[in-house]
Amino acid sequence: MKVEYHTVYLKKRFPLRISRGVFEGSDNLYISLTENGHTGWGEMAPGGTEGAETAAAGQAMLEQFCATGLSASIHDTWQNAHAAGVAPCALAALDMALWDLRAKQAGVPLYALLGLARRAVVSSVTVGINPPDVVRERVPLLLARGARALKIKLGSPEGIEADQAMFAAVFEAAQGSGAVLRVDANGGWSLKDARRMMGWLAEHDVEYIEQPLVRGAEDQLPDLFKDRAMPIFVDESCRMSGDIATFFQSVDGVNLKLMKCGGITEALRIVATARAFGLKTMIGCMGESSVSIAAGASIGALFDYIDLDSHLNLDPDPATGAPFENGITLPADQPGHGGVLSHA
Protein backbone atom coordinates (compact mmCIF):
# COMPACT_ATOMS: atom_id res chain seq x y z
CA MET A 1 0.00 0.00 0.00
CA LYS A 2 1.28 3.45 -0.95
CA VAL A 3 0.85 6.09 1.76
CA GLU A 4 1.20 9.81 0.98
CA TYR A 5 0.75 12.98 3.03
CA HIS A 6 -0.14 16.56 2.12
CA THR A 7 -0.41 19.60 4.38
CA VAL A 8 -2.71 22.40 3.23
CA TYR A 9 -3.57 25.68 4.95
CA LEU A 10 -7.33 26.14 5.25
CA LYS A 11 -8.25 29.81 5.47
CA LYS A 12 -11.66 30.65 6.86
CA ARG A 13 -13.85 33.03 4.89
CA PHE A 14 -15.03 34.51 8.19
CA PRO A 15 -12.94 34.01 11.37
CA LEU A 16 -14.86 31.81 13.80
CA ARG A 17 -15.12 33.09 17.35
CA ILE A 18 -16.41 30.80 20.08
CA SER A 19 -16.17 30.92 23.88
CA ARG A 20 -12.56 29.65 23.82
CA GLY A 21 -11.10 31.98 21.23
CA VAL A 22 -10.95 33.01 17.57
CA PHE A 23 -9.97 30.66 14.74
CA GLU A 24 -8.87 32.09 11.37
CA GLY A 25 -7.54 28.93 9.74
CA SER A 26 -5.42 25.82 10.20
CA ASP A 27 -2.81 23.64 8.52
CA ASN A 28 -4.69 20.41 7.92
CA LEU A 29 -3.07 17.07 7.14
CA TYR A 30 -4.33 14.85 4.33
CA ILE A 31 -3.45 11.19 3.93
CA SER A 32 -3.99 9.09 0.82
CA LEU A 33 -3.80 5.29 0.76
CA THR A 34 -3.43 3.68 -2.67
CA GLU A 35 -3.78 -0.02 -3.34
CA ASN A 36 -4.51 -1.84 -6.62
CA GLY A 37 -5.59 1.31 -8.41
CA HIS A 38 -7.90 2.64 -5.70
CA THR A 39 -7.12 5.60 -3.41
CA GLY A 40 -8.71 6.36 -0.06
CA TRP A 41 -8.59 9.87 1.40
CA GLY A 42 -8.48 11.08 4.98
CA GLU A 43 -8.06 14.42 6.73
CA MET A 44 -6.83 15.64 10.10
CA ALA A 45 -7.76 19.01 11.59
CA PRO A 46 -5.14 19.56 14.32
CA GLY A 47 -5.98 20.44 17.89
CA GLY A 48 -4.35 20.25 21.28
CA THR A 49 -7.32 18.55 22.91
CA GLU A 50 -7.42 16.13 19.98
CA GLY A 51 -3.85 15.02 20.65
CA ALA A 52 -1.86 16.68 17.86
CA GLU A 53 -1.49 20.45 17.75
CA THR A 54 0.14 20.51 14.30
CA ALA A 55 -0.07 18.66 11.01
CA ALA A 56 3.59 17.71 11.40
CA ALA A 57 2.92 16.08 14.77
CA GLY A 58 0.04 14.10 13.33
CA GLN A 59 2.05 13.01 10.31
CA ALA A 60 4.93 11.82 12.50
CA MET A 61 2.54 9.63 14.50
CA LEU A 62 0.97 8.17 11.38
CA GLU A 63 4.30 7.54 9.65
CA GLN A 64 5.57 5.61 12.64
CA PHE A 65 2.38 3.58 12.99
CA CYS A 66 1.82 2.86 9.28
CA ALA A 67 5.34 1.48 8.95
CA THR A 68 4.29 -1.64 10.86
CA GLY A 69 0.76 -1.33 12.27
CA LEU A 70 -1.66 -1.57 9.33
CA SER A 71 -3.92 -4.61 9.38
CA ALA A 72 -6.35 -6.13 6.90
CA SER A 73 -9.05 -5.35 9.47
CA ILE A 74 -10.01 -1.69 9.84
CA HIS A 75 -11.22 -2.36 13.38
CA ASP A 76 -7.94 -4.04 14.33
CA THR A 77 -5.99 -1.16 12.80
CA TRP A 78 -8.02 1.32 14.84
CA GLN A 79 -7.45 -0.59 18.08
CA ASN A 80 -3.73 -0.97 17.40
CA ALA A 81 -3.31 2.72 16.56
CA HIS A 82 -5.30 3.80 19.59
CA ALA A 83 -3.23 1.52 21.83
CA ALA A 84 -0.04 2.91 20.26
CA GLY A 85 -1.03 6.44 21.28
CA VAL A 86 -1.85 7.85 17.85
CA ALA A 87 -3.74 11.10 18.46
CA PRO A 88 -7.50 10.88 17.83
CA CYS A 89 -7.41 13.55 15.10
CA ALA A 90 -4.57 11.75 13.29
CA LEU A 91 -6.28 8.39 13.75
CA ALA A 92 -9.45 9.91 12.29
CA ALA A 93 -7.58 10.72 9.07
CA LEU A 94 -6.21 7.19 8.76
CA ASP A 95 -9.51 5.57 9.68
CA MET A 96 -11.63 7.51 7.16
CA ALA A 97 -9.04 6.85 4.44
CA LEU A 98 -9.23 3.11 5.15
CA TRP A 99 -13.03 3.13 5.02
CA ASP A 100 -12.94 5.18 1.79
CA LEU A 101 -10.48 2.72 0.24
CA ARG A 102 -12.52 -0.30 1.34
CA ALA A 103 -15.72 1.12 -0.16
CA LYS A 104 -13.97 1.99 -3.42
CA GLN A 105 -12.57 -1.52 -3.64
CA ALA A 106 -16.10 -2.84 -3.15
CA GLY A 107 -17.43 -0.41 -5.76
CA VAL A 108 -20.11 1.07 -3.49
CA PRO A 109 -20.70 4.31 -1.58
CA LEU A 110 -19.43 4.16 1.97
CA TYR A 111 -22.91 4.62 3.41
CA ALA A 112 -24.03 1.51 1.49
CA LEU A 113 -21.00 -0.49 2.63
CA LEU A 114 -22.04 0.30 6.20
CA GLY A 115 -25.63 -0.76 5.53
CA LEU A 116 -27.01 2.76 5.74
CA ALA A 117 -29.43 4.75 3.61
CA ARG A 118 -28.64 7.97 1.75
CA ARG A 119 -30.83 9.83 4.20
CA ALA A 120 -31.16 13.59 3.91
CA VAL A 121 -30.82 15.33 7.29
CA VAL A 122 -30.71 19.13 7.48
CA SER A 123 -27.31 20.40 8.65
CA SER A 124 -26.84 23.29 11.04
CA VAL A 125 -24.79 26.20 9.71
CA THR A 126 -22.73 28.00 12.35
CA VAL A 127 -23.01 31.64 13.37
CA GLY A 128 -19.91 32.55 15.39
CA ILE A 129 -19.78 35.03 18.26
CA ASN A 130 -19.94 38.52 16.76
CA PRO A 131 -21.32 41.99 17.49
CA PRO A 132 -25.03 42.29 16.65
CA ASP A 133 -24.41 44.51 13.60
CA VAL A 134 -22.09 41.88 12.07
CA VAL A 135 -24.63 39.14 12.76
CA ARG A 136 -27.39 41.11 11.03
CA GLU A 137 -25.25 41.22 7.89
CA ARG A 138 -24.03 37.61 8.02
CA VAL A 139 -27.22 35.69 8.74
CA PRO A 140 -28.92 36.73 5.47
CA LEU A 141 -25.84 35.50 3.58
CA LEU A 142 -26.13 32.07 5.22
CA LEU A 143 -29.85 31.89 4.53
CA ALA A 144 -29.27 32.88 0.90
CA ARG A 145 -26.83 30.00 0.59
CA GLY A 146 -29.57 27.58 1.60
CA ALA A 147 -29.18 27.26 5.37
CA ARG A 148 -32.33 25.89 7.03
CA ALA A 149 -30.90 25.51 10.54
CA LEU A 150 -28.57 27.93 12.35
CA LYS A 151 -26.29 26.95 15.21
CA ILE A 152 -25.58 30.10 17.19
CA LYS A 153 -22.36 30.20 19.18
CA LEU A 154 -22.82 31.80 22.59
CA GLY A 155 -20.74 31.84 25.77
CA SER A 156 -19.23 35.23 25.04
CA PRO A 157 -16.39 36.34 27.34
CA GLU A 158 -18.40 39.57 27.71
CA GLY A 159 -21.14 37.69 29.55
CA ILE A 160 -24.72 36.61 29.01
CA GLU A 161 -25.93 40.14 28.28
CA ALA A 162 -23.70 40.09 25.20
CA ASP A 163 -25.04 36.63 24.38
CA GLN A 164 -28.61 37.88 24.54
CA ALA A 165 -27.85 40.90 22.36
CA MET A 166 -26.20 38.73 19.71
CA PHE A 167 -28.94 36.10 19.79
CA ALA A 168 -31.59 38.81 19.45
CA ALA A 169 -29.83 40.00 16.29
CA VAL A 170 -29.85 36.46 14.85
CA PHE A 171 -33.49 36.02 15.81
CA GLU A 172 -34.39 39.27 14.09
CA ALA A 173 -32.37 38.53 10.95
CA ALA A 174 -33.84 35.03 10.62
CA GLN A 175 -37.47 36.10 11.08
CA GLY A 176 -39.72 34.75 8.36
CA SER A 177 -37.07 32.38 6.97
CA GLY A 178 -38.37 29.28 8.72
CA ALA A 179 -34.83 28.46 9.87
CA VAL A 180 -34.51 26.30 12.99
CA LEU A 181 -32.39 27.90 15.75
CA ARG A 182 -29.96 25.91 17.87
CA VAL A 183 -27.40 27.15 20.41
CA ASP A 184 -23.91 25.98 21.38
CA ALA A 185 -22.27 27.61 24.42
CA ASN A 186 -19.01 25.62 24.08
CA GLY A 187 -18.82 25.40 27.87
CA GLY A 188 -18.94 29.17 28.26
CA TRP A 189 -21.52 29.42 31.06
CA SER A 190 -21.64 28.88 34.79
CA LEU A 191 -24.47 26.75 36.17
CA LYS A 192 -26.35 29.90 37.20
CA ASP A 193 -25.96 31.54 33.80
CA ALA A 194 -26.86 28.31 32.00
CA ARG A 195 -30.17 28.08 33.89
CA ARG A 196 -30.98 31.69 33.11
CA MET A 197 -30.00 31.49 29.45
CA MET A 198 -31.79 28.21 28.79
CA GLY A 199 -35.03 29.65 30.14
CA TRP A 200 -34.61 32.78 28.05
CA LEU A 201 -33.70 30.86 24.89
CA ALA A 202 -36.67 28.52 25.31
CA GLU A 203 -38.90 31.58 25.00
CA HIS A 204 -37.28 32.22 21.61
CA ASP A 205 -37.99 28.77 20.14
CA VAL A 206 -34.45 27.37 20.40
CA GLU A 207 -34.44 23.63 19.67
CA TYR A 208 -31.63 22.56 22.02
CA ILE A 209 -28.58 23.73 23.94
CA GLU A 210 -25.16 22.20 23.38
CA GLN A 211 -22.37 22.04 25.98
CA PRO A 212 -23.76 24.66 28.39
CA LEU A 213 -21.12 23.87 31.05
CA VAL A 214 -17.38 23.57 30.70
CA ARG A 215 -15.84 20.13 30.30
CA GLY A 216 -14.92 18.99 33.80
CA ALA A 217 -18.15 20.32 35.33
CA GLU A 218 -20.18 17.22 34.49
CA ASP A 219 -21.01 16.84 38.19
CA GLN A 220 -23.24 19.94 37.80
CA LEU A 221 -25.22 18.47 34.91
CA PRO A 222 -27.78 16.68 37.13
CA ASP A 223 -28.80 20.01 38.69
CA LEU A 224 -29.16 21.62 35.28
CA PHE A 225 -30.91 18.60 33.77
CA LYS A 226 -33.72 18.22 36.28
CA ASP A 227 -35.20 21.66 35.59
CA ARG A 228 -34.03 22.05 32.00
CA ALA A 229 -36.05 24.29 29.73
CA MET A 230 -34.82 22.50 26.60
CA PRO A 231 -32.85 19.38 25.60
CA ILE A 232 -29.18 19.32 26.61
CA PHE A 233 -26.46 17.89 24.35
CA VAL A 234 -22.83 17.49 25.34
CA ASP A 235 -19.91 17.87 22.96
CA GLU A 236 -16.59 18.55 24.66
CA SER A 237 -17.66 16.26 27.53
CA CYS A 238 -18.02 13.27 25.17
CA ARG A 239 -14.94 12.08 23.34
CA MET A 240 -15.17 8.28 23.30
CA SER A 241 -17.97 5.75 23.71
CA GLY A 242 -16.75 4.94 27.22
CA ASP A 243 -17.50 8.50 28.38
CA ILE A 244 -21.25 8.16 27.93
CA ALA A 245 -21.88 5.96 30.96
CA THR A 246 -20.64 8.73 33.27
CA PHE A 247 -23.32 11.28 32.36
CA PHE A 248 -26.10 9.56 30.38
CA GLN A 249 -28.70 10.24 33.08
CA SER A 250 -28.04 13.99 32.94
CA VAL A 251 -28.23 14.79 29.22
CA ASP A 252 -30.57 14.28 26.30
CA GLY A 253 -27.94 13.62 23.66
CA VAL A 254 -24.30 13.57 22.58
CA ASN A 255 -22.44 15.33 19.77
CA LEU A 256 -19.55 13.33 18.35
CA LYS A 257 -16.84 14.61 16.04
CA LEU A 258 -14.53 12.44 13.98
CA MET A 259 -11.51 14.48 15.11
CA LYS A 260 -12.38 13.90 18.78
CA CYS A 261 -13.13 10.20 18.65
CA GLY A 262 -10.63 8.95 16.08
CA GLY A 263 -12.82 8.45 13.05
CA ILE A 264 -15.72 6.42 11.74
CA THR A 265 -14.88 3.21 13.59
CA GLU A 266 -15.28 4.76 17.03
CA ALA A 267 -18.15 6.97 15.83
CA LEU A 268 -20.16 3.82 15.14
CA ARG A 269 -19.49 2.66 18.71
CA ILE A 270 -20.52 6.02 20.15
CA VAL A 271 -23.82 5.93 18.28
CA ALA A 272 -24.53 2.38 19.43
CA THR A 273 -23.70 3.25 23.04
CA ALA A 274 -25.77 6.43 22.99
CA ARG A 275 -28.75 4.58 21.57
CA ALA A 276 -28.40 1.87 24.21
CA PHE A 277 -28.68 4.57 26.88
CA GLY A 278 -31.68 6.16 25.17
CA LEU A 279 -29.86 9.30 24.02
CA LYS A 280 -30.20 11.37 20.86
CA THR A 281 -27.18 11.69 18.58
CA MET A 282 -25.50 14.47 16.64
CA ILE A 283 -22.42 14.61 14.43
CA GLY A 284 -20.42 17.82 14.28
CA CYS A 285 -17.15 19.03 12.81
CA MET A 286 -14.11 21.16 13.50
CA GLY A 287 -12.05 23.11 10.94
CA GLU A 288 -12.44 20.48 8.23
CA SER A 289 -12.67 20.55 4.45
CA SER A 290 -14.87 18.45 2.18
CA VAL A 291 -12.75 15.31 2.70
CA SER A 292 -13.62 14.89 6.36
CA ILE A 293 -17.09 16.39 5.93
CA ALA A 294 -17.81 13.80 3.22
CA ALA A 295 -16.72 11.03 5.59
CA GLY A 296 -19.06 12.36 8.27
CA ALA A 297 -21.93 12.73 5.81
CA SER A 298 -21.51 9.07 4.85
CA ILE A 299 -22.73 8.05 8.30
CA GLY A 300 -25.26 10.87 8.54
CA ALA A 301 -28.23 8.48 8.43
CA LEU A 302 -27.34 7.38 11.97
CA PHE A 303 -27.93 10.80 13.54
CA ASP A 304 -30.86 12.82 14.78
CA TYR A 305 -28.99 16.08 14.14
CA ILE A 306 -26.17 17.02 11.81
CA ASP A 307 -23.70 19.90 12.02
CA LEU A 308 -21.42 19.36 9.00
CA ASP A 309 -20.74 22.83 7.67
CA SER A 310 -17.11 23.85 8.24
CA HIS A 311 -16.27 23.42 4.54
CA LEU A 312 -18.77 26.16 3.72
CA ASN A 313 -16.61 28.72 5.56
CA LEU A 314 -13.37 28.00 3.69
CA ASP A 315 -11.76 30.33 1.15
CA PRO A 316 -11.14 28.16 -0.77
CA ASP A 317 -12.08 24.59 0.08
CA PRO A 318 -9.14 22.57 -1.33
CA ALA A 319 -11.31 19.47 -1.57
CA THR A 320 -14.54 18.31 -3.20
CA GLY A 321 -17.15 15.72 -2.35
CA ALA A 322 -19.53 17.27 0.19
CA PRO A 323 -22.21 19.19 -1.71
CA PHE A 324 -24.57 21.42 0.29
CA GLU A 325 -28.02 21.44 -1.28
CA ASN A 326 -31.21 22.87 0.19
CA GLY A 327 -29.67 22.98 3.65
CA ILE A 328 -28.40 19.40 3.51
CA THR A 329 -24.80 18.15 3.40
CA LEU A 330 -25.30 15.16 1.15
CA PRO A 331 -23.38 11.87 1.33
CA ALA A 332 -21.70 10.90 -1.92
CA ASP A 333 -23.60 8.63 -4.29
CA GLN A 334 -20.40 7.14 -5.70
CA PRO A 335 -17.85 4.59 -4.49
CA GLY A 336 -16.17 5.65 -1.25
CA HIS A 337 -17.07 8.63 0.91
CA GLY A 338 -16.63 11.01 -2.03
CA GLY A 339 -14.13 13.43 -0.51
CA VAL A 340 -10.98 14.13 -2.55
CA LEU A 341 -8.18 16.66 -2.12
CA SER A 342 -8.42 18.49 -5.43
CA HIS A 343 -5.46 20.83 -5.02
CA ALA A 344 -2.64 21.06 -2.51
UniProtKB/Swiss-Prot annotation:
Further remarks about this protein from its record: Part of a large, functionally divergent protein family. Protein modeling and substrate docking was used to predict the substrate specificity, prior to biochemical analysis.
Gene Ontology biological-process entries: amino acid catabolic process; peptide metabolic process
Residues that hold substrate according to the record: T126, K151, I152, K153, K257, D307, L308, D309
Cofactor entry: Mg(2+)
UniProt xrefs under PANTHER family: D-GALACTONATE DEHYDRATASE-RELATED, ENOLASE SUPERFAMILY MEMBER DDB_G0284701
Function: Dipeptide epimerase with a preference for hydrophobic substrates. Catalyzes the epimerization of L-Ala-L-Thr, L-Ala-L-Met, L-Ala-L-His, L-Ala-L-Phe, L-Ala-L-Tyr, L-Ala-L-Trp, L-Ile-L-Ala, L-Ile-L-Ser, L-Ile-L-Met, L-Ile-L-His, L-Ile-L-Phe, L-Ile-L-Tyr, L-Ile-L-Trp, L-Phe-L-Met, L-Phe-L-His, L-Phe-L-Phe, L-Phe-L-Tyr, L-Phe-L-Trp, L-Phe-L-Ser, L-Phe-L-Thr and L-Phe-L-Lys (in vitro).
Matching InterPro entries: DgoD-like, Dipeptide_epimerase, Enolase-like_C_sf, Enolase-like_N, Enolase_C-like, Mandel_Rmase/mucon_lact_enz_CS, Mandelate_racemase_C, Mandelate_racemase_N_dom
One function term, GO molecular function aspect: racemase and epimerase activity
Keywords, in A-Z order: Isomerase, Magnesium, Metal-binding
EC code(s) of this entry: 5.1.1.-
CDD domains: L-Ala-DL-Glu_epimerase
Positions with a binding annotation for Mg(2+): D184, E210, D235
Keyword Magnesium: yes
Enzyme class of the recorded protein, top EC level: isomerase
Cofactor, free-text remark: Binds 1 Mg(2+) ion per subunit.
Protein name in UniProt: Hydrophobic dipeptide epimerase
Family the UniProt entry places it in: Belongs to the mandelate racemase/muconate lactonizing enzyme family.
